[in-house]
């Protein structure tokens, strides 16, 4: 380890910045957040530094560097393009055992600035010691996207309660379990993201009381897993999955997504394939509520988006009625994700001015209560979930109500997976084509399907 990572307290500490250009200004911006007393020595100041000086955020102590300027300085930042001058200042500072950073010159640095992820009071610094700055930038971008902005306020809230909880929960092991449960639960982060700070504070207070009285709190998170490819899971979805105590998932959820959960999370398959349910909807609702009431952070993980033909609304009605805290994390619905992976734009100025999503699954026996005339517009794209179930009936009704028999049709199975299969035909051919692919399938009907051959980019076209 060439560099020791440290977090330095600079509040009211004198820091000398040598240089007055834009590079110096960038370092000043970082230093301002620490409360340091920032002194500048430079012949001239760039416009940004002049503005900062006008606001009295920095002190311009001189135009020419003097050795005496190093007196009582905590650290020095050198930001000029004069190599010889930089070397001189560095040597003077080194002799006085003052920490020095010379911008973009690691050989003249006794400390370096890491890439900083600021979720104050939580701070993360990343560095390669100057070996791979582009790689560090990529890592920073990755972490920035994964760490919620709310985590800083959550940490501050925990700091406010830390001593009180220490007084109430004296056993160090139980206290650690308390904090782990509180943070894994995700309720506080959810409330903070909504701006409900008072309720977030109340959750901690209630958690302390519940701990003292041996009561538990739980929650339900409805998460859309996307159409298949685990890369289409949202960042928010990943964050919530990783807080789950129990995951209730459908058959269609990619196992690779389940592998992203905590190792100690209990994963339970609850079915949900058309005409093949391992558990009834009412029993599932009751089971989910029961788990949450036992104090578990329950994630209900569904393929696609939970609110589009996913019965998510029905499940949350039951959860809400039971008085359990819940949240919803949208997912990329199959109609959009699968179409994109098939190279089929659902709208196009030349071919389609609107798109309709419908399901091929009927809740009860009998005919659809569908306005077929509305779907007969040849400038409209129709996307049918679980389309294999009633494809013949759908085809006949569309043709009967004026849809052209040669309207292009796409039948897609295992969409967004590497082994996805796409069959292209026409509306009149749908009856025979539908049995050539495995369930579940997505049907796309409309002239936009003709673009598949031109812009197909993924899988088996």
UniProtKB/Swiss-Prot annotation:
Pfam families: CysG_dimeriser (PF10414), NAD_binding_7 (PF13241), TP_methylase (PF00590). Residues 1-204 are annotated as: Precorrin-2 dehydrogenase /sirohydrochlorin ferrochelatase. GO terms for biological process: cobalamin biosynthetic process; methylation; siroheme biosynthetic process. One of its GO terms (molecular function) is uroporphyrin-III C-methyltransferase activity. S-adenosyl-L-methionine binds at residues 227, 303-305, 308, 386, 415. Pathway: Cofactor biosynthesis; adenosylcobalamin biosynthesis; precorrin-2 from uroporphyrinogen III: step 1/1; Cofactor biosynthesis; adenosylcobalamin biosynthesis; sirohydrochlorin from precorrin-2: step 1/1; Porphyrin-containing compound metabolism; siroheme biosynthesis; precorrin-2 from uroporphyrinogen III: step 1/1; Porphyrin-containing compound metabolism; siroheme biosynthesis; siroheme from sirohydrochlorin: step 1/1. This is Siroheme synthase. It comes from Blochmanniella floridana.
């Amino acid at each position: 380890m060439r560099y020791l990572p440290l977090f330095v307290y600079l509040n009211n500490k004198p820091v000398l910045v040598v240089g007055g250009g834009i590079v110096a200004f960038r370092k000043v911006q970082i230093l301002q957040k620490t409360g340091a007393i920032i002194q500048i020595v430079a012949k001239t100041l760039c416009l940004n530094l002049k503005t900062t000086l006008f606001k009295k955020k920095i002190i311009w102590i001189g135009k020419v560097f003097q050795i005496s300027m190093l007196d009582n300085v905590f650290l020095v930042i050198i930001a000029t393009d004069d190599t010889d001058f930089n070397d001189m200042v560095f040597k003077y500072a080194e002799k006085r055992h003052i920490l020095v950073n010379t911008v973009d010159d690691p050989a003249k640095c006794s400390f370096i600035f890491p890439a900083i992820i600021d979720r104050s009071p939580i701070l993360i610094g990343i560095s390669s010691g100057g070996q791979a700055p582009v790689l560090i930038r990529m890592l920073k971008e990755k972490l920035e996207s994964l760490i919620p902005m709310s985590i800083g306020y959550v940490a501050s809230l925990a700091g406010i309660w830390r001593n009180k909880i220490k007084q109430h929960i004296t056993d160090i092991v139980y206290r650690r379990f308390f904090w782990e449960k509180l943070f894994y639960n995700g309720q506080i982060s959810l409330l903070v993201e909504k701006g409900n700070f008072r309720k977030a504070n109340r959750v901690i207070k209630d958690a302390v009381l519940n701990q003292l009285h041996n009561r538990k709190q739980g929650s339900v998170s409805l998460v859309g897993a996307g159409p298949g490819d685990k890369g289409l899971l949202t960042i928010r979805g990943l964050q919530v999955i990783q807080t789950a105590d129990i995951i209730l998932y459908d058959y269609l959820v990619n196992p690779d997504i389940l592998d992203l959960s905590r190792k100690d999370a209990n994963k339970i398959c609850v079915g949900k394939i058309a005409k093949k349910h391992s558990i009834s909807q009412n029993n599932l609702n009751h089971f989910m509520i029961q788990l949450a009431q036992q104090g578990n952070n329950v994630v209900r993980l569904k393929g696609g988006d939970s609110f589009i033909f996913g019965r998510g609304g029905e499940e949350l009605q039951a959860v809400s009625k039971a008085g359990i805290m819940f949240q919803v994390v949208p997912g990329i619905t199959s109609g959009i994700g699968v179409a994109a992976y098939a190279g089929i734009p659902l709208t196009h100025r030349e071919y389609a001015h609107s798109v309709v999503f419908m399901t091929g699954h009927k809740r009860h026996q009998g005919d659809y209560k569908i306005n077929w005339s509305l779907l007969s517009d040849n400038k409209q794209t129709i996307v049918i979930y679980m389309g294999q179930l009633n494809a013949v009936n759908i085809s006949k009704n569309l043709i009967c109500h004026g849809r052209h028999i040669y309207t292009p049709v796409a039948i897609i199975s295992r969409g967004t997976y590497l082994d996805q299969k796409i069959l292209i035909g026409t509306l009149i051919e749908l009856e025979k084509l539908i049995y050539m692919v495995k369930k579940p399938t997505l049907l796309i009907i409309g002239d936009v399907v003709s673009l598949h051959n031109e812009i197909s980019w993924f899988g088996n076209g």
